[in-house]
């Protein structure tokens, strides 16, 4: 069924101001500071994200309440939010970004804190099709999360707005096609297009939603937010965390790309100079062939959360964070965390979801619930540390400050390639680990005779919270010398600059 916020736009546009709230399609006044953020010499690449956020937050807050309903005993309040007009140099249409916002308020909701989950959706459908609401989390799942945690849950859709049309481009673009295209536009003129990468307006829309929630949830004094999102929406959640001090914790799902230069080099070498087929949009826009250029280094300054460690925004990366990755991600390698996890300051936990591809939506609620409950109860996360001790008898040493109720080792082997994608038929199996009285265990692992093996330790705690070690990949060689074999499209790779093959 089409949600009320999508079916009632014509009616809503005729509404007048009420309770200090503007109709959803009221004109957004021109804001010169927004243009300044795109190209002013005094705004550097590491400041553009925050500059744009601050400029948008200075604009009037434009939204309309469109209805109230009940979902399995939880009150749901629906809004239509206009977050911004975004069209650097007039290159993008439609410029106006609108979003369905659903706020789930459980009975006896705890005050001050809310969870904000960014989701997808198609607000501007292609010719001949209809607008589509978010497909990531059903209302029942969001209501269940609110009930289980006694926490207000906010679902923000249309991150990013899509499909978008770009000047001179005949193809309306969505998801990674849209992200990659904005990157290609940025790379052509970085100094003039610092607000061009699509994550910039995505992060600003998250901030606008926090402002809406503060106003509408004033009786609960909501002013602190836990951000969550998957893939590019998880990336935007990192960016919103950097830009907005109202964010007190972040849970990014399947966006295992901090320290972009090191991670991308590792990925290219792992695939024998090729790229996973999931990178198709970025390869088509020439992104993967520009990784060594000065322009890409400037993109990294803006895009890469880890680069903000060297800026005044370093403290924003110290908020509690629960990084959730997939063991068989279509985009990212299971051991990418080696390039960034230990460098992240502050309270943190890692979870690797075994036998999962990039689409991990079924695990989001069960992963979030114990994390949020611990925040609400002011209970610390378990402090976990792990190291690989190599040698003739390699071991993973795993230590937890809190005793788990279950401890197991997950492992998978690919005898042909350093490739652990779920789409390639790789499956992990688990082995129980005896608990150690002292909190530290040494877990034997093996270097396979052929190919590579991946290992991680998983700890489950009494409240259902799950924390894992980083994933360690062992083989007689660190990297292969050729691209992995494939027998179907989802498991293929794309030609890279250093590869001798086309599509394998």
Regions found by a protein language model. Name each.
Residues 294-356, 400-407, 416:
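Serine-hydrolase catalytic core
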């Amino acid at each position: 069924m089409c949600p009320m916020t999508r079916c009632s736009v014509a009616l809503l546009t005729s509404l007048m101001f009420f309770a200090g709230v503007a109709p959803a399609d009221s004109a957004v006044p021109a804001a010169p500071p927004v243009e300044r953020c795109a190209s002013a010499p005094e705004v550097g690449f590491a400041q553009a994200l925050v500059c744009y956020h601050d400029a948008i937050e200075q604009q009037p807050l434009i939204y309309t309440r469109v209805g109230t309903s009940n979902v399995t005993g939880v009150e749901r309040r629906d809004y239509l939010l206009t977050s911004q007009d975004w069209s650097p140099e007039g290159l993008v249409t439609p410029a106006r970004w609108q979003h369905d916002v659903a706020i789930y308020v459980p009975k006896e909701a705890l005050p001050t804190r809310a969870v904000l989950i960014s989701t997808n959706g198609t607000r501007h459908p292609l010719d001949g099709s209809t607008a589509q609401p978010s497909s990531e989390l059903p209302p029942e799942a969001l209501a269940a999360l609110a009930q289980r945690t006694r926490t207000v849950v906010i679902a923000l859709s249309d991150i990013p707005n899509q499909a978008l049309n770009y000047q001179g481009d005949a193809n309306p673009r969505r998801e990674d096609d849209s992200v990659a295209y904005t990157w290609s536009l940025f790379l052509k003129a970085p100094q003039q297009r610092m607000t061009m990468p699509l994550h910039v307006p995505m992060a600003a829309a998250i901030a606008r939603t926090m402002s809406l929630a503060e106003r509408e949830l004033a009786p609960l004094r909501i002013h602190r937010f836990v951000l969550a999102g998957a893939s590019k929406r998880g990336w935007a959640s990192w960016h919103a965390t950097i830009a907005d001090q109202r964010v007190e914790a972040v849970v990014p799902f399947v966006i295992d790309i901090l320290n972009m230069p090191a991670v991308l080099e590792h990925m290219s070498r792992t695939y024998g100079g090729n790229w996973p087929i999931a990178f198709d949009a970025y390869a088509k826009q020439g992104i993967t062939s520009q990784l060594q250029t000065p322009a890409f280094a400037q993109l990294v300054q803006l895009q890469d959360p880890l680069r903000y460690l060297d800026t005044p925004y370093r403290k924003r990366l110290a908020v509690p964070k629960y990084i959730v990755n997939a063991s068989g991600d279509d985009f990212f390698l299971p051991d990418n965390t080696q390039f960034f996890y230990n460098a992240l300051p502050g309270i943190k936990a890692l979870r690797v979801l075994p036998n999962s591809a990039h689409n991990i939506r079924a695990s989001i609620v069960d992963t979030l619930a114990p994390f949020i409950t611990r925040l609400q109860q002011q209970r610390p996360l378990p402090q976990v540390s792990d190291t690989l001790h190599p040698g003739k008898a390699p071991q993973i040493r795993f230590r937890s400050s809190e005793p788990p109720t279950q401890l197991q080792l997950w492992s998978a082997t690919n005898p042909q390639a350093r490739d652990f994608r779920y789409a390639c038929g790789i499956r992990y199996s688990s082995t129980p680990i005896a608990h150690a009285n002292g909190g530290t265990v040494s877990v034997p692992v093996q270097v396979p005779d052929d190919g590579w093996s991946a290992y991680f330790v998983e700890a489950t705690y009494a409240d259902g919270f799950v924390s894992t070690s980083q994933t360690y990949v062992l083989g007689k060689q660190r990297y292969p010398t050729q691209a992995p074999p494939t027998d179907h499209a989802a498991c293929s790779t794309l030609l890279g600059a250093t590869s001798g093959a086309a599509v394998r």
